[in-house]
């Protein structure tokens, strides 16, 4: 080997990316299990997913509260005992409630799987929702809300979603002191009984599994029809966006910083323009070298960071441009955002910039597939949205092959300043 000669540089777009296929098993009671095996490290990730997000709420906050309190006590274990069991084995048991789904995720060493699965089973199948835990949850969440409501960026995030989707839509509905006060144990138990059932459960496993992993899963989750059977119909909920487009809110009259949000509705991931828009959004504001960062951060110095993102909601998406800037330059920041929108409409993206973004996006995907935990997350995202590997590969081809002319047409269609909601919170 001649070490005076550097190895050839290979662009990310030249890599032939393959999404490692999963193995699928079915427990005795019908629960599907999706598996990505890896023996690189003696660690395991086990995630249970339920259709128990805010989309299915009849009362505000019941999805998040139910999900949180399931880990805070069962008929056999107190919250302290659950946490001590997990911590003693160096593991993590996390729970999250999103718009559509709710999850429980266990990370542990492979050798501790058999000891920890009974704890997870207890949390999923036998939560007791203690009154004192609900009271503590309300108190803590109200304190957090009171603190966050003093922050302009938190307030801006709440309002922009309300403007885009409406006060009563799950994507636009926000927490409140009254909503926390209204939470009742009976309501949470009813939500739990309806949504956390065996036939609504899907299991995703990644990492180095013990040899008897499937037998263990079957023992704890597959032998009975726990919590009964519940047939859920995903309701169609109307979106009611605000009629006005421009808003200025003074949350703190003496504030020196403002939170800027510029956003518009956009079709969801099933629309053919969505993969193309991911490329345009990256050029515009999706990475550190974007148009917005180069102009508003590097050139003008108005902010430490400005980004544009595409929401990945199931019903409808949105384009959201967000930053925090000095109070006296918020309006100037908005003007520069619109200038960059119009620049993409009027001038094709130079080939050098497009090639750079292609390599950045493909490189990011390569990084996202580094390891079994990352691969199962990619598959989970596809499976939960009724998509397959063709969607993944089509997106890669879009990144590699989209032209500057196509991007310019997208900008003309979706980057019209008059279509955007505009919000400043100081």
Regions from the PLM with identified roles:
Residues 1-82, 189-295, 334, 420-426:
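His/Glu-rich zincin catalytic helix
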Residues 1-6, 26, 81-232, 267, ...:
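Charge-rich, well-structured scaffold segments of protease-associated domains
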């Amino acid at each position: 080997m001649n070490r005076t000669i550097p190895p050839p540089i290979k662009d990310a777009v030249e890599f032939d990316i393959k999404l490692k296929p999963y193995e699928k098993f079915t427990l005795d009671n019908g629960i599907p299990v999706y598996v990505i095996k890896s023996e690189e490290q003696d660690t395991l990730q086990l995630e249970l997913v339920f259709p128990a997000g805010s989309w299915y709420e009849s009362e505000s906050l019941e999805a998040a509260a139910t999900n949180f309190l399931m880990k805070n006590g069962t008929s056999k274990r107190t919250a302290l005992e659950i946490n001590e069991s997990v911590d003693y084995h160096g593991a993590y048991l996390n729970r999250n409630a999103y718009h559509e789904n709710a999850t429980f995720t266990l990370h542990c060493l492979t050798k501790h799987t058999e000891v920890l699965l009974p704890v997870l089973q207890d949390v999923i199948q036998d939560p007791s929702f203690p009154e004192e835990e609900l009271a503590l949850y309300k108190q803590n969440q109200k304190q957090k809300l009171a603190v966050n409501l003093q922050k302009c960026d938190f307030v801006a995030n709440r309002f922009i979603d309300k403007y885009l989707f409406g006060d009563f839509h799950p994507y636009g509905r926000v927490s409140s002191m009254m909503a926390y006060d209204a939470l009742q144990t009976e309501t949470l138990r009813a939500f739990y009984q309806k949504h956390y059932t065996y036939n609504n459960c899907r299991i995703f496993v990644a990492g180095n599994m013990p040899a008897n992993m499937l037998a263990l899963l079957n023992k704890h989750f597959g032998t009975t029809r726990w919590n009964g059977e519940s047939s859920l119909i995903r309701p169609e909920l109307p979106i009611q966006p605000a009629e006005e487009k421009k808003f200025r809110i003074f949350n703190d009259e003496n504030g020196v910083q403002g939170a800027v949000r510029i956003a518009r509705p956009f079709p969801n991931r099933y629309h053919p323009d969505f993969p193309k828009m991911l490329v345009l959004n990256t050029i515009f504001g999706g990475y550190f070298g974007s148009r917005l960062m180069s102009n508003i951060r590097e050139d003008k110095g108005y902010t430490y960071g400005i980004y544009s993102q595409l929401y990945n909601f199931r019903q409808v998406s949105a384009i959201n441009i967000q930053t925090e800037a000095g109070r006296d330059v918020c309006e100037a920041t908005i003007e520069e955002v619109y200038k960059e929108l119009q620049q993409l409409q009027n001038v094709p993206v130079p080939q050098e910039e497009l090639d750079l973004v292609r390599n950045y996006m493909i490189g990011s995907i390569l990084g996202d597939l580094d390891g079994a935990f990352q691969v199962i997350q990619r598959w989970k995202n596809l499976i939960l949205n009724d998509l397959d590997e063709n969607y993944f590969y089509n997106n890669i081809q879009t990144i590699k092959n989209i032209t500057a002319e196509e991007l310019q047409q997208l900008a003309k269609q979706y980057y019209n300043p008059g279509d955007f909601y505009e919000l400043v919170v100081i």
